[in-house]
């Protein structure tokens, strides 16, 4: 897990929390980048990153102690040919480590939701604290969909801490240098560098629900979650959140939640403890070459609406799902259904284009215009976005 932190200064825990991200500087970095550039960023930004230590409770049994769980892994069955004896579950304390960064002088720390969501105790370790002090924190707000969590310090250090700055994640492009700072394997502050590998990647922090992330090859390992991904100005342009790996360790593919996404939701997390994500209320699939051929489309692009949730904005706006199918060569294909090809006059090639537009540009209560193909005819449909329900 990684956790990052924006600067903070000591305050009273009872102080009213406010948050206003500093203006983003979108100008490209000028001048050459060399080893000195990385050294200077690491030196100037490491102090604003924190280590997060958590404790959580889980129920365990004798099977867990021996690594059992039934089947061929059960030691009683393996060695004695006997069933596992009945054992009352017992509660166990589990410790974990992550990263975070302070985003406001009142003592607000940003990290990943998965770092703290089950925590019964959260402690913060500030870089450079030679006495090894840990400061207790609590969860102020969480957003599982963007894997973001906002912490508030209960205990405060005596000294004022440096403040991290947000950069404009929309300005990042493949090939741009980035730096990650985190707490891999609980080792403490560690710096790695890489480049942006891709932008606009779909990511699924909650099953069936996708969000946009940045992809990087900067080394991220367990303990890094929640830490900052920095551009070459030392500005936070992402929160490191996950890796793609069979082994569970770094394999060259890491993901970060864009800073623009986070800065959008933080004020609402402060006020309400959660963020209401806008919702359309449809299911469907991207148009691929086979589907384009069956539906007699000139190009394999767009998003086919297969089903519309009753009572949803899409339903109220009159969006239509699939009503007819046909089996061709043993595979069932839809023969109708609205095809979304634009949102607010922006082209839609696949579902990720819709989701990214919702994430970047839209909020609950906004009106969104859909450009659709229905029975070969182009038309516009407008709908009012509502809060995504817990389906």
Which ranges hold each PLM region?
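Serine-dependent protease modules
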Residues: 3-301, 306-310, 351-366, 376-380, ...
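Conserved PDZ fold ligand-binding element
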Residues: 109-113, 316-351
